[in-house]
Structure formats: C-alpha cells, structure tokens
C-alpha cells in the first residue's frame, strides 16, 4: 500500500455533483493498493495515519496526531500512486494491485478504518471523483508499506 498524506484544513470528495465524503481539519489520504495488501498492512498503515504527529501543540511543535485532536480522515482511492515513469513520458500503471483486487482491498481498508476510528470518510473506487482540499502547511507525507515494514 502506498499513501500520500496531506494535512488539510478541510477536504471533500464529490461524485456526479454529490458530496460523498467530507472532513474538516484532518488528513486526506490518497490510497494506492498493492497485491497482497491484507489486514496486517491495513492495521500498520492506518495506525500511521491516525498516530502521525503532524499537528502543532500549544508550543507550535508538530507533536499531535489526528487521534489526539479528534480530527477527520478522508480516504481516497488513487491507483496512479503506483505509476512507473522510468521509461518514456507515458506512465505505466502495471504496478500495484489489479482493479478487482484493488477495489476489494480498498473497500476492506475503509471498513477496517471505520471500525477503528470514528471520523473516517471515503471516496469510491474507480469513480470519477472531484477532490477538493485546502492544504494546511502544506504538510505532505509519503508512506509505502513495502519500505516501512
């Protein structure tokens, strides 16, 4: 699994003019699924999302997490995180999980997240989504389960 985490003042996902996920302060996570991602990966990566200390405390140090502050998490599927652009100018999307596996894994990841944290919203796999966000910082963190564990 690969994640692009962005600290946001607010973020939302709209599909066909309808808002399907929305948070105020928190983390927007663009989520790319890989072959073999399972509950052990979900647990480790979601713990990173909720425990990463990227919010300021009273002394303006990045010392607080989403869970410390009861902020929201917006999970947005994004297979392009696994793009390979090493050859030519057109990225290849052959890396990462195939669509059926990625859909199931993403939906299971969202289910896991919602069971373990009360403020989780999500986009929809393979939908034409419009993602709006206001970066806060900006703070952007890249996480890859193959490199973290």
Which residues fall in each region the model found?
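Glycine/charge-rich, flexible interdomain linkers and switch-proximal surface loops
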Residues: 58-73, 121-133
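Short beta-strand segments
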Residues: 6, 32, 77, 142
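Short, low-complexity, polybasic intrinsically disordered segments
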Residues: 93-96, 136-149
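Short, conserved loop-to-beta-strand elements that form functional interface hotspots
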Residues: 103-132
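Residue-level signal for inorganic ion chemistry
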Residues: 45, 76, 139
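Compact, glycine-rich, soluble single-domain proteins
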Residues: 19-70, 83-111
